[in-house]
């Protein structure tokens, strides 16, 4: 399928075998950029994205956190926007989705305690479906037990969790991403261009101009 569009006077062509149906797992205090940017980007290229949170419904919101790099030894944290969910968690049937997106921030810390969430992550990996995780999203991958023998990027503070889960931590720049089979990972939001470009490639979406 080809969707032409004009941007800055240039004709862009977005090619994909078909529009994909994607699931995004979010929770309270997910990172602001890492939630909204992939959500809007994937919608913009023609995919369907269902953003869900355990025990919440479409129209409910999650609070987000803004993580920034301001010269301290770790990231700073501020209150972000409210992000509105567009699908009921209870209605999620993983077999009907083509890919999974996991933002970082605080949310993965508690989402990994929910066996329903871990089962969703395992389904996508066992089915070989594309999974995109950024920053602390790797905590869900580790808790789901899907990193054995895999190479995974994450926020550097998550490197011990990646290794303890049997994975190899990809030591890449904060603006870079890494693809290992169906798994596309990155250290933080500065990597969004590389991370989303690699995820779109794994999904089979091409943008030409």
Residue ranges and their predicted role:
Residues 9-127, 140-151, 159-209:
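Extended, subdomain-level signal for the structured scaffold at the beginning of enzyme domains
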């Amino acid at each position: 399928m080809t969707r032409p569009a004009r941007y800055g006077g240039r004709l862009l062509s977005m090619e994909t075998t078909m529009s994909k149906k994607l699931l995004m797992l979010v929770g309270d205090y997910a990172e602001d950029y890492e939630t909204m940017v992939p959500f809007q980007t994937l919608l913009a290229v023609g995919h369907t994205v269902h953003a869900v949170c355990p025990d919440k419904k479409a129209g409910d919101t999650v609070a987000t956190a803004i993580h920034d790099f301001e010269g301290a030894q770790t990231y700073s944290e501020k209150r972000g926007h409210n992000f509105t969910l567009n699908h009921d968690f209870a209605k999620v049937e993983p077999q009907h989705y083509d890919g999974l997106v996991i933002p970082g921030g605080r949310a993965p810390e508690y989402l990994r305690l929910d066996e329903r969430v871990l089962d969703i992550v395992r389904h996508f990996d066992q089915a070989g479906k594309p999974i995109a995780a950024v920053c602390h999203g790797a905590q869900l991958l580790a808790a789901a037990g899907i990193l054995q023998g895999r190479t995974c990027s994450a926020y550097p503070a998550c490197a011990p969790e990646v290794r303890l889960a049997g994975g190899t931590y990809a030591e890449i720049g904060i603006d870079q991403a890494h693809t290992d089979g169906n798994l596309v990972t990155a250290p933080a939001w500065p990597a969004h261009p590389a991370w989303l470009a690699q995820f779109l490639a794994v999904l089979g979406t091409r943008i030409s101009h």
